[in-house]
């Protein structure tokens, strides 16, 4: 669905095609929502978030704010007033500037922390879901697993040929992500740690996560590329990604594959938490939204969308 890639949500398109809910990346709640907002849209939380988390925060938002009384364009636009899909860096900037009251993102980069500090804004982080950071290569690449040490060597430039890690005698084509993106922040902080990365070539930094994946898949005839992203984005995000999945594979790390079971039990090495971030003293309506997401009903939505919940999902919500 194009709504996944749009800068903001096509609420009208969604409203007129409820049967296509799945293609818009939205998931129904089980049972009646335990939280409902009033008709006073000015008090609703303003929810911004990264692309990979869109199916989560949009599904919740549309179930918790009132349905428009009229199906005219104005009512529909007001309902989408508080929802904006963006990139991680822009979501943080929106929170710092005050246009967003809660954002759904990965952990902040050093640059984002510094900008908040300079603006005199203290941020509050609430983890609510678990996610894996994964490495993708062409489906024909003979390498199926890398050690953490080998990953560092490849992305620092110390290892530049696949045959050094059990692959073909080919130069490794390393793909990076832009600074301040959620993926690059995790790559530097969790994976590389104190090891400097290769300088990113301009041609290999792709702005959209989907773009990175498309580029890796394009190299199937010379299977020499490696890139990184989030597990959910490449396995569940939308139809285009699923088509690409037939041309790429996810590498095991230290022999442990990034399956949902291994994410849940913590054996896969590169696990990250997804966060809701607010200012230090959020509005009461924003705090209710955050609290709902870590409640049993909110955690059930996390699980139903395809992420791994951090807390217990609702045991009594097995019925619709």
Predicted regions span which residues?
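Exported/periplasmic ABC-transporter solute-binding proteins
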Residues: 1-131, 136-320
């Amino acid at each position: 669905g194009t709504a996944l890639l749009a800068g903001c949500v096509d609420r009208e398109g969604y409203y007129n095609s409820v049967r296509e809910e799945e293609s818009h990346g939205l998931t129904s709640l089980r049972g009646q929502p335990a939280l409902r907002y009033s008709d006073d849209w000015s008090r609703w939380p303003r929810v911004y978030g990264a692309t990979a988390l869109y199916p989560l925060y949009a599904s919740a938002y549309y179930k918790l704010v009132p349905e428009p009384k009229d199906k005219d364009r104005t009512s529909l636009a007001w309902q989408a007033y508080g929802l904006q899909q963006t990139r991680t860096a822009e979501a943080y900037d929106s929170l710092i500037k005050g246009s967003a009251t809660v954002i759904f993102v990965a952990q902040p980069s050093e640059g984002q922390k510094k900008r908040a500090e300079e603006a005199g804004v203290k941020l509050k982080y609430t983890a609510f879901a678990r996610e894996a950071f994964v490495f993708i290569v062409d489906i024909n690449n003979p390498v199926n697993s890398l050690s953490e040490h080998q990953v560092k060597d490849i992305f620092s430039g110390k290892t530049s040929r696949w045959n050094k890690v059990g692959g073909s005698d080919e130069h490794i084509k390393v793909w990076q992500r832009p600074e301040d993106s959620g993926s690059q922040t995790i790559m530097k902080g969790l994976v590389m740690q104190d090891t400097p990365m290769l300088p990113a070539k301009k041609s290999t930094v792709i702005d959209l996560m989907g773009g990175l994946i498309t580029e890796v898949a394009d190299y199937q005839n010379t299977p020499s590329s490696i890139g990184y992203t989030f597990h959910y984005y490449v396995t569940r995000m939308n139809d285009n990604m699923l088509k690409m999945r037939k041309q790429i594979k996810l590498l095991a790390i230290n022999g442990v594959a990034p399956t949902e079971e291994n994410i849940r039990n913590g054996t896969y090495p590169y696990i990250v938490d997804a966060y809701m971030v607010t200012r230090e003293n959020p509005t009461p309506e924003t705090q209710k939204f955050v609290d709902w997401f870590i409640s049993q009903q909110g955690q059930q939505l996390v699980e139903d969308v395809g992420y791994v919940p951090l807390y217990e999902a609702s045991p009594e919500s097995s019925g619709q």
